[in-house]
Amino acid sequence: MDTGPDQSYFSGNHWFVFSVYLLTFLVGLPLNLLALVVFVGKLQRRPVAVDVLLLNLTASDLLLLLFLPFRMVEAANGMHWPLPFILCPLSGFIFFTTIYLTALFLAAVSIERFLSVAHPLWYKTRPRLGQAGLVSVACWLLASAHCSVVYVIEFSGDISHSQGTNGTCYLEFRKDQLAILLPVRLEMAVVLFVVPLIITSYCYSRLVWILGRGGSHRRQRRVAGLLAATLLNFLVCFGPYNVSHVVGYICGESPAWRIYVTLLSTLNSCVDPFVYYFSSSGFQADFHELLRRLCGLWGQWQQESSMELKEQKGGEEQRADRPAERKTSEHSQGCGTGGQVACAES
């Protein structure tokens, strides 16, 4: 007799979901921490507007990764929510907000890059740092305001049933909840995905055209890498996820495959470091220098550990030799006190 939990609300493999979350966490966290160190160092030396935007994007990715273990616990528990309920809407709010923050900041970075190349003289005479700060605040507010729908849905109607009949978190919805959620999702897909995608596509297409006419090969390669990483984010990580919003609005319910395209959207935290890497030659130089320092510290630690092991092994060998030396010394002292015959016989 099957006594396992009812998973009619989720027909997929929850261990696959857990594996994707775990992979994202293990790969994305160290990469974004390295990027955070580089951006903080750059802003302390010579602050640039694009670095302000990318620093906010890094902070957004780290926020997603820090809350990802909650999703991992949920997946390991068969897509049930075993944690205190107050953490359910909070984790959902952080999760979806950071996803859309990436799209907004990528669009802002594309505008910044386009202006610096298409209008270099005008760009240099403008106070970009203050504007970059205001744009960052606007992006955080815009994404947060839209994704606050998580709280509206979770606490609308009968709160006692807000976790669904299976104790789930933001997986099951009543008809009155879907009447609110599906139109909001469609609006989010248009405002927070389609519009940033159009802006980013225009800016980078113009940027490639300008550099193709007279830019250096090194700069062309860097822009090509930046464009590839950005399009990978939009088309692979975010595209299918936002398509599920459109399909859900048309069908009147969330599609069954939505959970899997949501997994794709979490992978953006692993792709964003490549956006940082191709964003500027200065980031590449600082990143390589940081890696050299870390490798040097690792080599120094290994050398010190090896020396400690050798000293420890040498000390053990000396302690093992002391009883034999003591026995030999006592034997020779006995021979010197009149036991020559016995010593000779031995």
From Swiss-Prot:
It comes from the Eukaryota. This is Free fatty acid receptor 3. The chain crosses the membrane at residues 20-40, 48-68, 89-111, 133-153, 179-199, 223-243, 259-279. Highest level in adipose tissue, and lower expression across all tissues tested. Expressed in sympathetic ganglia. GO terms for cellular component: plasma membrane. Pfam families: 7tm_1. Changing residue 174 to W: Abolishes activation by propionate. Disulfide bonds join 88-169. Keywords: Cell membrane, Disulfide bond, G-protein coupled receptor, Glycoprotein, Immunity, Inflammatory response, Lipid-binding, Membrane, Receptor, Transducer, Transmembrane, Transmembrane helix. PANTHER family: FREE FATTY ACID RECEPTOR 2-RELATED, FREE FATTY ACID RECEPTOR 3-RELATED. Residues 307-346 are annotated as: Disordered. Its main location: membrane. It is a multi-pass membrane protein. GO terms for molecular function: G protein-coupled receptor activity; lipid binding. Residues 41-47, 112-132, 200-222, 280-346 are cytoplasmic. Glycans are attached at residue 166. G protein-coupled receptor that is activated by a major product of dietary fiber digestion, the short chain fatty acids (SCFAs), and that plays a role in the regulation of whole-body energy homeostasis and in intestinal immunity. In omnivorous mammals, the short chain fatty acids acetate, propionate and butyrate are produced primarily by the gut microbiome that metabolizes dietary fibers. SCFAs serve as a source of energy but also act as signaling molecules. That G protein-coupled receptor is probably coupled to the pertussis toxin-sensitive, G(i/o)-alpha family of G proteins. Residues 1-19, 69-88, 154-178, 244-258 are extracellular. InterPro entries: GPCR_Rhodpsn, GPCR_Rhodpsn_7TM, GPR40-rel_orph. Belongs to the G-protein coupled receptor 1 family. It is found in: Cell membrane. CDD domains: 7tmA_FFAR2_FFAR3.
